Structure formats: structure tokens, C-alpha cells
Amino acid sequence: MTPEFSRPVRIDTLGGSPRALAIEAGEEERATLARRFGLVAIDALSADMRLSRDGDAVTAAGTLRAEVIQSCVATDAPVPARIEETFTILFRPQPAGGADDEIELGESELDVVFYDGATIDAGEAAAETLSLTLDPWPRSADADAALRAAGIRSEEEARAEEERAKAARSPFATLRKP
């Protein structure tokens, strides 16, 4: 499967000094990524990065910028967001073994992307970075009011009500003076 926002970089074209790379998603790429990530729209998506090679490993460090529109989890209203996220990704060759083998990564290796072959995909790495920066629970400005109108309490209200109910069920509740 070809990624929606593919920007392949051949590793053998990277020399000893870092190489600057600027990528930007076109309109069709943004539309297909929006569908992939369940977004209303992606109005802009770009990344500026420096690629550094050390043997078979390539480090991409830079900044991702995006303008997205998500749906409010409470009202389904559009929630625009502007994203600017710095990232550092280490591309390493796929380890020997099957694709389904479990690979243990240390904490310092959490942003590792494995590649197979002679290229890395800077666009797909940017798309994955975008997906990780999205708000998992976007809420519009009127979300709280809509939830209250539907009879849904906030966590604080539910917690306070539970505490009152717990105190009322206490065997010592009848000993309390009014």
C-alpha cells in the first residue's frame, strides 16, 4: 500500500553532512489523509527537517506544521486546530526476522521507524507524527453546555454526587446532626 503522503528519500543520496528537506502535502493528499485519520479536513500540512545519516540509520529532526479541523466529540461541531510540533525520528533498517516478530525498544528508541530497502519515507513519517499530535477528544466551545442539556454530568459533578451517595450509605450517617 502506498502512503497518501509519500516522500521517499533514497538513503544512498544522504552524505556525511545533514540535508535539509521541506515537504508539503497537496490538496488530494490532505483529503485522503483526513479520511484516514477521521478528520473533517486538513487545510495545510508541511514539515521542514534535516536528515542526517549514520551508517544505515537516518535521523530526521524538524518541525511539523498543520491546520486541521476535527469533529467535537460531544456536538460533532467542527473544531479547528493549528499544530506546530517538533520531532526527531530515527529510521533504522528492519531487523532480521519476520515482520510479526515482537521487537523490544528502549525508552530512548520510541520514535524509531523501521524501513525495508534503500529508501525512507519522510512524508509518511510526517503523517504519522501528525496523527500522534491530534487531540484525541476535541471539544467545541459549547460542548459542556450541550452535554449538560443532554443530562450528562462532568467528571467533577459525578464524583461529588458519588461522594454524597457514599456518605449517605454510611452506617454512621444517621448519627450526623443536621
Sequence positions of predicted segments:
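A positional/architectural concept
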Residues: 1-65, 69
